[in-house]
């Protein structure tokens, strides 16, 4: 084809090739057997809230999260009274992280006395987070959505959306696809053939 600039090349072919590549990357990243995400959070309220929001949208788009890495925890050997309130607040926030993210394992790393850089410090960080565990091991195997029920009792599509507000949810339907919207974000879920002719009962 001829592009507006007058060059004769297979521009559409290049565009299609790009989309094919992006689709392969998406399939790789959304396959929990191949890829998973670990969210890093500091034990601070604002950071926790933003991490919760990120986790919601990762679930919405089908990306598996297998662990929470809690970073920059003031270690017990810091006994200066100046940090007493900071340490107490961190412990409260760490407890909240454990509650908020449900079954996801929470691994903890201390606040080092210097910037983390270089192999020696990175090894110390890895030891603190993983100890004897293999970092390449999948820490949690959860589903981003599943279908429950049967033709007699009805089917339920379950999409875990931690921390999402029901008032922010919208659901649209075409014959073979559901579009789920959470605030400004949306996800399209392709339905199996058995559900194509069924009506949505409730959300």
Per-range role (PLM):
Residues 22-164, 179, 184-186, 190:
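C-terminal lobe/tail of nucleotide-utilizing enzymes
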Residues 3, 7, 185, 196:
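Extracellular/lumenal and peripheral-membrane lipid-interaction modules
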Residues 1-34:
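Switch- and interface-adjacent substructures of P-loop NTPase systems
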Residues 167-172, 177-181:
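Beta-strand-rich binding/interaction modules
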Residues 152, 173, 196-198:
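Short, solvent-exposed coil/turn segments
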Residues 167, 196-203:
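Beta-rich strand-turn-strand
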